[in-house]
Amino acid sequence: MEPVTKWSPKQVVDWTRGLDDCLQPYVHKFEREKIDGEQLLKISHQDLEELGVTRIGHQELVLEAVDLLCALNYGLETDNMKNLVLKLRASSHNLQNYISSRRKSPAYDGNTSRKPPNEFLTSVVELIGAAKALLAWLDRAPFTGITDLSVTKNKIIQLCLDLTTAVQKDCLVAEMEDKVLNVVKVLNGICDKMMHSTTDPVMSQCACLEEVHLPNVRPGEGLGMYIKSTYDGLHVITGTTENSPADRSQKIHAGDEVIQVNRQTVVGWQLKNLVKKLRENPTGVVLLLKKRPTGSFSFTPAPLKNLRWKPPLVQTSPPPTTTQSPESTMDASLKKEKPAILDLYIPPPPAVPYSPRDENVSFSYRGHTKSKQPLPGRKGSESPNSFLDQESQRRRFTITDSDQLPGYSVGTNILPIKMRGKTPSYGKPRPLSMPADGNWMGIVDPFAKPRGHGRKGEDALCRYFSNERITPIIEESASPVYRFSRPLTERHLVRGADYIRGSRCYINSDLHSSATIPFQEEGPKKKSASSSAKASSGEPSLLVSWLTRLKLLTH
């Protein structure tokens, strides 16, 4: 590879054409000034201002790409794992010494000032830069396969985050320096541990460049490489596809960095411009790769399986049933290749409990209708959760009762039931003379004889029953002779028919307002009950109504 310092102005212009899209308007300015490779590596913010690159963000993009070229040109033969650890150790030690010497100065104002000096911030930036260079090595193969180095990498990342957070926090400079010192001490310990505990020769080996030719690429086949680009413009190969040109070459491995494509340096380029350069020559590609040292690790290519799904083979005849031992079954399963269907990602089931979708589903149960829209049939394209929606609608009609309820039926054209209008006294507060509890009635004995109704009793009832022309509550059974003994806990429940609500119920005589439990009736029974209600809903005398209520309460 030709050194960057030997580049001609044309090579510099060709390199700038692959940078970020926002930098393309400045390409002709580089061409007009005829900047060569040596001038490019020494370019600064002031030089970019003179070129017309006035925006700070655009200047930073150019300088980041130039930094990658400097690392490639000057650090290729010197950078290794050991040197990078030593650089990080030196940067952290320098920052620690700067803080200590500054605190010894008589002019130290860290306890009153909130603005750190520029030298302090510069040392922090240098420390983070050294850490990034080391992390770039730890994040590649073969170091990613070592557990200890992976843990160390995560610790360094966390310490760098703590360092940047401490510097950007609005606090006294002394507090900021205390936090930075804590981070620096931990970094020094990590560097010392890496230097003394690691004896593998891979720590001292440098990276190398290797040229790879991929000829005879068939149209539409592709190269079979998976490339990941970092935020600053490094392009790293993460794997290859089986039986692809990249895989057949046996020279492209996971962790290799793409430096040139067809003799054009692509460091710092956008990924889309790199892909365009790879497709420039359809017959073949020449790659220049930067390879990390392998050392004593078993470093082999990392092929990736084709992600296209292949359907499993259909069995025409059932396999013969033979008894096999667990050992033979395990060996056979290891020898067989895993079917492609097992590679598919199956999403997990919905969270429990399942919440049904709001759909207008009509169910008819013994004459009661919830909605008018019919239930849609199960289709092949629906998800399995659609059946759960139907089941959740069915569970709403489960009634806890001694009677066995038959199955439901789906209704399509069912007339809605006309609901009874509200009485004028609906929502009014109870009379002031009505006590809050039912203790005024005393304990009702179901085996006691009915009391006679005199004028005094009628006056007592007049205080508690309003004269609102409400249909009376008629007993279900007219013969009070046959009485069945109930448990003590059920003695205060009297079974009757509440025609105000339109259904049979259990009435608690100890309460001033009856709490009802809906009890669904048969169709014919309900029709007969409604007809009898119409017959008895004439206008009975007030005395009959009182007597009926009193007779019900005495049970």
Swiss-Prot record:
Q: Which InterPro entries match?
A: CNK1-3_SAM, CNK2/3_dom, CNKSR, CRIC_domain, PDZ, PDZ_sf, SAM, SAM/pointed_sf
What does the similarity note say?
Belongs to the CNKSR family.
**Which intervals of the chain are annotated as region Disordered?**
308-333, 348-391, 518-538
Descriptive protein name: Connector enhancer of kinase suppressor of ras 3
Q: Which CDD domains match?
A: PDZ_CNK1_2_3-like (cd06748), SAM_CNK1_2_3-suppressor (cd09511)
Q: Which residues carry this modification: Phosphoserine?
A: S381, S383
Keywords for the protein's UniProt record, in alphabetical order? Cell membrane, Cytoplasm, Membrane, Phosphoprotein
- Domain (CRIC): residue spans on this chain: 80-174
Q: Where is the composition biased (Low complexity)?
A: 311-329
Question: Quick one: signal sequence residues?
Answer: none
Q: How does it assemble?
A: Interacts with epithelial sodium channel ENaC. Interacts directly with SCNN1A (ENaC subunit alpha) and SCNN1B (ENaC subunit beta) C-terminal tails. Interacts with ENaC regulatory proteins NEDD4L, RAF1 and SGK1.
Q: Which GO terms describe its cellular component?
A: apical plasma membrane; cytoplasm
* Domain named DUF1170: residues: 325-546
Organism, by scientific name, is Rattus norvegicus (Rat)
Pfam families associated with the record? CNK2_3_dom (PF06663), CRIC_ras_sig (PF10534), PDZ (PF00595), SAM_1 (PF00536)
Task: List each copy of the PDZ domain by range.
Answer: 211-293
